[in-house]
């Protein structure tokens, strides 16, 4: 553990000068544009500020505020010392200065729901400018209003329940087996890397019909790895920096997408039905009036969204299950039952009915998302003055609904830092999943993750084949940390042992 923390701390120290320079540049530019210094007061006049009952809190250091403390590395199964101390001192709603802006931080389940349900009326999505610079101005992550609704509608139609059943379920199972069949008995490897390989190949296939293992697919994957390092780095566009390299990789990735688009347009113009490909690229070209730039950003952002969070959630599930043999046993029993029913039907592939029978599997998925918190918090901006629980939150301020703080709240979840999938078992006769209005792993409201059902399908199918065919243990100690996104410092090294078919059928 000490070595792990030392490694993470050294990375933080390496990036501190870059982060500080970026913040200084941002502050200098912003303050110069503001008149009368109102920026420092969140755009409120002294008279207005005097009438307001702002949440308690502190501004932190000049220029940098409390950003460094907020982003300090900590285990993914905790909210971190910064949040713990601030909640203890100020309560679940407090003010701070983060990412160069006056900010209200919410660890309150009710306020978080209120924020997500009032998207476009009182709040709007507001990610740092550098995110838009690297994902593209037409990325769904940064769009607001009608443009976001149009992009989201295209994604939802492509990921409809009909397509999930008929197209995506077989594809998910095929890509799962491609990964698992390559695992050698008693071999050791990075589970996180394998999860990334699985989700990337799946998304590349369904976005642009790129097959796993092909040279172009592997080249795209390498560029994507460089691209991702820049997404989580300081936004300094200087030669040699991760952000600069990521922008170059973005251009290379867009070049691949653009070539695929040109090839597809040519095929469509010839009306060659034999070469029609049922992927997102074809869907966007035929089902929308999007411009070329919009399609490029849409495909890049969905490659990012559909790969990164799903792979981390899957790695977290493997990690949590390794430490809970009882859950693995119940999971295996559920999937042995499904496999037996498959054989009785004379089938060898999963059906949609099989998927809907994975009740305990969904409990495991929910608990993984609750405890691991792949998406820790969301960036929002207040667009109208808000009054909530006696506090005034001024228009123009940033507000961060911290989903992880709610999911790890002991007043909402008993023993919240323990992996307990049984907490999601319904106590009713229906045998379904227990519901919780405070559980928001995919966000909510009009910006609810368009790929949430696909993400759950991916995890369920992968776990089905994993527990039927393998046992596993950690090859060396590792655990997920937040820095600033969730990651395993060592890549989650595991050793796998294949289960004999006779054992599987018992």
UniProtKB/Swiss-Prot annotation:
Heme binds at residue 449. Keywords: Iron, Membrane, Metal-binding, Oxidoreductase, Transmembrane, Transmembrane helix. Pfam families: p450. Disulfide bonds: none annotated. GO terms for cellular component: endoplasmic reticulum; membrane. Its main location: membrane. GO terms for biological process: brassinosteroid biosynthetic process; brassinosteroid homeostasis; jasmonic acid mediated signaling pathway; leaf shaping; response to brassinosteroid; sterol metabolic process; unidimensional cell growth. Pathway: Plant hormone biosynthesis; brassinosteroid biosynthesis. Its cofactor is heme. It is found in: Membrane. The keyword Iron applies. Its EC number is 1.14.14.178. It catalyses: a C28-steroid + reduced [NADPH--hemoprotein reductase] + O2 = a (22S)-22-hydroxy C28-steroid + oxidized [NADPH--hemoprotein reductase] + H2O + H(+); campesterol + reduced [NADPH--hemoprotein reductase] + O2 = (22S)-22-hydroxycampesterol + oxidized [NADPH--hemoprotein reductase] + H2O + H(+); campestanol + reduced [NADPH--hemoprotein reductase] + O2 = 6-deoxycathasterone + oxidized [NADPH--hemoprotein reductase] + H2O + H(+). It is an enzyme of class 1 (oxidoreductase). It is a single-pass membrane protein. It comes from the Eukaryota. The chain crosses the membrane at residues 12-32. InterPro entries: Cyt_P450 (IPR001128), Cyt_P450_E_grp-I (IPR002401), Cyt_P450_sf (IPR036396). GO terms for molecular function: fatty acid 2-hydroxylase activity; heme binding; iron ion binding. Belongs to the cytochrome P450 family. Catalyzes the C22-alpha-hydroxylation step in brassinosteroid biosynthesis, which is the rate-limiting step in this biosynthetic pathway. Catalyzes the conversion of campesterol (CR) to (22S)-22-hydroxycampesterol (22-OHCR, 22-hydroxyCR) and of campestanol (CN) to 6-deoxocathasterone (6-deoxoCT). This is Steroid (22S)-hydroxylase. The gene is CYP90B2.
């Amino acid at each position: 553990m000490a070595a792990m923390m030392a490694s993470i701390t050294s990375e933080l120290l390496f990036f501190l000068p870059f982060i500080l320079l970026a913040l200084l540049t941002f502050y200098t530019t912003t303050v110069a544009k503001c008149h009368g210094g109102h920026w420092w007061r969140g755009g409120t006049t002294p008279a207005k500020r005097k009438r307001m009952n702002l949440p308690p809190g502190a501004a932190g250091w000049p220029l940098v505020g409390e950003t460094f403390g907020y982003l300090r590395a900590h285990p993914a199964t905790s909210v971190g010392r910064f949040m713990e101390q601030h909640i203890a001192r100020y309560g679940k709603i407090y003010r701070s200065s983060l990412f160069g802006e006056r900010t209200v931080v919410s660890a309150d389940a009710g306020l978080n729901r209120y924020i997500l349900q009032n998207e476009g009326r009182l709040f709007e999505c507001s990610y740092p400018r550098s995110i838009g610079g690297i994902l593209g101005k037409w990325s769904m992550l940064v769009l607001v209003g009608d443009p976001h609704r149009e992009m989201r509608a295209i994604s939802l139609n492509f990921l409809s329940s009909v397509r999930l059943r008929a197209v995506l379920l077989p594809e998910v199972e095929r890509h799962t087996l491609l990964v698992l069949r390559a695992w050698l008995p008693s071999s050791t490897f990075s589970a996180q890397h394998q999860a990334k390989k699985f989700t990337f190949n799946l998304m590349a296939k369904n976005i642009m019909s790129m097959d796993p293992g092909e040279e172009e697919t592997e080249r795209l994957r390498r560029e994507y790895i460089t691209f991702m390092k820049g997404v989580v780095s300081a936004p300094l566009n200087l030669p040699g920096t991760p952000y600069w390299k990521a922008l170059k990789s973005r251009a290379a990735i867009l070049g691949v997408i653009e070539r695929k688009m040109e090839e597809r347009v040519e095929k469509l113009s010839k009306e060659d039905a034999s070469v029609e490909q049922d992927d997102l690229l074809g869907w966007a070209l035929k089902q929308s009036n999007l411009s070329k730039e919009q399609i490029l950003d849409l495909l890049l952002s969905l490659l990012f969204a559909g790969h990164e969070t799903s792979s981390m959630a899957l790695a977290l599930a493997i990690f949590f299950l390794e430490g809970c043999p009882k859950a693995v046993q119940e999971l295996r029993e559920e999937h042995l039952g499904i496999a037996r029913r498959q054989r009785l039907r004379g089938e060898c592939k999963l059906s949609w009915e099989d998927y809907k029978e994975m009740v305990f599997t969904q409990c495991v998925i929910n608990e993984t998302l609750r405890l691991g918190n792949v998406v820790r918090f969301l960036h929002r901006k207040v667009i109208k003055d808000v009054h909530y629980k006696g506090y005034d939150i001024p228009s123009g301020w940033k507000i961060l609904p911290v989903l992880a703080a709610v999911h790890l709240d002991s007043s909402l979840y008993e023993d919240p830092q323990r992996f307990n999938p049984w907490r999601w078992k319904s106590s009713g006769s229906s045998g379904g999943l227990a519901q919780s209005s405070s559980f928001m792993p995919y966000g909510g409201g009009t910006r609810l993750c368009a790929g949430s059902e696909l993400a759950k399908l991916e995890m369920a199918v992968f776990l089905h084949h994993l527990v039927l065919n393998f046992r596993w243990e950690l090859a060396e100690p590792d655990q997920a940390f937040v820095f600033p996104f969730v990651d395993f410092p060592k890549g989650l090294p595991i050793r796998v042992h294949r289960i004999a078919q006779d054992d599987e059928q018992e």
